[in-house]
Amino acid sequence: MNITRYISKAVLASSAFCSIAAVSIGTLTSCDDFLDVKSETVAKENELFETKEGFQDALTGCYELMSSQNAYGKNMSFYMVDALANYWDMNLPMGGSENADISEITLFDYESDDSRQLIENTYLQMYKTILQANIILKNLQTNGHVIGNSQLRNMIEAECYAIRAYCHFDILRVFGQVPQNATKTVSLAYNESTSIDEMPPFYKYDEFVAKLKADLDKAEKIMKEYDPVYNHTFYETFPNTTNSVSLSEEYLYYRRMRLNYWAVRATQARLALYTGDNATAHSLAVEIINAKSDNGESIVQLSDLKPSLDNGKTVIYPSLPSENIFSLSVFNLLTYTNTYFPLEKIQRSSLVISDAQYNKLYEGQVTASHNRYSYWWRRCTTNQSAVGRVLTKYYWNTNSDTGLAPNAYNNLFIPMIRLSEIYLMAIETTTDLAEANSLYNTYMRYHNVLLDADAFASLNDVKNVIIDEYRRELIGEGQMFYVYKRLCSPSILWHSTNVSEADYVVKLPLTK
């Protein structure tokens, strides 16, 4: 399989009928118009699922929907959700940021026209993705026999359950109530239907979480039997490498780029931690860290973020592809990350942190060797010579900043789950001080920081350090807001006022 062709594939016919179903209804003027669109949608659907390739294209379409700018390609990663975490300095660009939507989001203003539009676009895209996964699941029941390979058929089913759960979980983390001691309750739609003319049922928090667990359990059970990466390393599931395994279907390669067994386990760990089940979160995190292939190699390893030789070129991959448990390919990533993270002059569209923020972020760290400090940031100026720091996580080579690196996979993606986060989860949830110190020692060693002594004298020390580590590690990935929210933290670094419970509950859009 050609990796460049694979990750740059346009949204296919499946996405087209899903788009008609999910968003065009609002523009219809009569019942006849609606029925015409519905008939066209059904026709496209029936045609698509007549072949194995149609199912594959539909699933690829799900990931395309997830990787769009209205979902994880921007809003659910470095833009809207990281603005909720108050990472970006909205005042540093000359004249102030032109990103009015997230300027308001940073203040937890969910009522302005700009922020409401951003929220609505994101909400719709997430449910559009879920709807497409449901359509695939429905057609697997009625027409799955056209997929002769049972491993492929089962993996398509499992990935759809995983996609549905993954998207619903982040809807919960953005729009749902705080998970502990909530005084403001919120019911959310958990959509298991393919209907485009009926509102899905809404569920209370505990019911919604039960739905999430059920879908993740279904995905895990199937993937444990059929996913190649269950007993092979991620590297082995890339074709044409020295250790590539032989798989029955080309579509089963590149497991890191789609929801897989270990990504499901990691999502289960995230859910357990979010809902306060620290023991389960710890058990799952340690399981992932210790996971071995049939030949005894680690399924996934931490990245040391060092320059490496790739097809004859010395390159740096700041997004740490080798430790990604799940990532989304975004073939046009640099066409818009250049807008938000410019490597020369800071513009009004730029997402930046100030020098003061930068120093606070790495306060107390061994910055002389810390590889995130060295490779994730670039010092830039505005037209008025104000200084800020630009995140370089989504650039392929911070040494040259020019030309594509040889391996397209290593630079055209958004990290969704990384092993570094799993380490931090294990450190946060352990009740064994020695284990906390051992895990943290390993974690910091891969940051090129060698500790002379144990970092923690008590488990209380862990609590004091871990939030800073999450904040440093997860910037640009849309995860830090969820850390603050599950703790219902009364303060967020760089937010000037106390944060209330209501601030953590993004207002549901009015759209249907």
Over which residues does each language-model region extend?
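Membrane-proximal, proline-rich intrinsically disordered regions
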Residues: S30-N86, V330, G478, I492-K512
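Short, surface-exposed recognition loops and adjoining beta-strand edges that mediate ligand/DNA contacts
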Residues: N46, M76-L92, Q177-K184, L188-A189, ...
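Elongated scaffold/linker segments in the mid-to-C-terminal portions of large proteins
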Residues: Q117, E207, E225, L259, ...
